[in-house]
Amino acid sequence: ATGQLLFHLMDKIASLPRQTIEMLLTFSDNLLFETELVIRDAIRGQNLGLSKEYVTLEESGIVLRRPLTYKAERKLSQDFDTNIALLDLESRPKQKEFAEAVIRELDNTDISMIQAQTGIGKTYGYLLPLLAQSDVDKVVVAVPTKLLQNQIMNQEAKALSAVFNINFHSLKGPQNYIKLDAFYQTLLRQDSNRLVNRYKMQLLVWLTETETGDLDEIRQKQRYMAYFDEIKHDGKLEADSLFAEYDFWQQSYQKAQEARVVVTNHAYLLTRMEDDHDFVRGKTLVIDEGQKMVLALEQFSRHQVNLTVLLQHIHRILDSGSQSLLQQRLLENLQFEVSHLIQEHQQFPQKQYNRQQLDRLLQTISELEGESDLMEMLSPLKTPLYSHFWLETDYYQEHRVTYLKASRQELLELSAYLPSAQKVIIVSATIDVGPDVDVADLLGLDQVRKVSLPMDTLPNQAIWIDQSMPMIGIASEE
């Protein structure tokens, strides 16, 4: 087995472009024992030319996989069972019933909220009927988490792309993508940590394979997150960038405009709709697991800053002595304001603040320039959207961490961004939250058409009640 693994490794290295192997050699001293010799052997006899599937920028030596070109889309059948069969799947009665409900709702101009039980294959249930309609141009699908987003791209999207040539794109925030400029700068140095240098080698190989630049494709990166924080994208692209034409975040933005189906997550959907009110204009928007969008709206209306980490960071900057006199004074003012807030919180834990009460802190933040890490932590507080501030402290065995938290006066009005969409379909495992409240109310939506599909009662569920405990309604506060 070890010998087979070695042969596989040798074949893999030999299949890489020569330019990539040469860059691997610059870091090969960080490998264990004599593994470097395998790389040196692989470069012998390597062709100097570069295959058409790759592209390289001579100044950096980094080799990338050339962006894919998409084939003409195949037309889907109007019959759900036929499309399912073409995917080599079997149609399920409840899945088909759900798909038929989706088709019926397309003629309704109101927002449609469809309640359907879990486990019936809802993703194909809404994708197939929507993609089969000639008047449905583009579709945006929002799911609760990046994990589910990746799952759809690896399963349903991959199958639909293979059979029908449907152009899917997974859209995430810029921090999910590698920034090639930042990565290139790390290649110009040999880190003292061998693990970091091995990650550089891994990324050089990965860049010859990835079509997205999505760092979620890298496994076990949590082992050294500090390095990945250094090379993740910040959403900015310098005019003189060596990689302007191949920047993954810019490519992702462009692909999102061209794709037939864009898959994103609830949190990033809210971010994009707030930044770009036309993001869903003329498109069919499907919010999957709509009941969880309520939590995303609540999280989106808040922001927090770790004041303990902030103070540590300010202290390190001041100790370095590299700042100008003005910057030093501003940092000292910021340090004083933050320390004062923490001390005040220890005396009055329930105290809340408005923007006027934090005016000096916010003013110092606005004047502070050149400290990008600090600004990244603090800049969201400058927006007038946040009106209420308070502090919270988490206690651990040997230390405590204090956070400055900010919230908006009201939750984001989701309905303000939806009228531009061609059609909005919210799929939810439940519509009713209580006797007088439902998911639509919590999302702040009016003119919602609610459709509840029959749901099977699951016989394997049980609720256990401890009868020795007092009833909540009659128990005293003591």
Region spans (language model):
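A contiguous, basic/glycine-rich beta-loop/short-helix subdomain that forms a polymer-engagement track
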Residues: 236-257, 275-276, 364-477
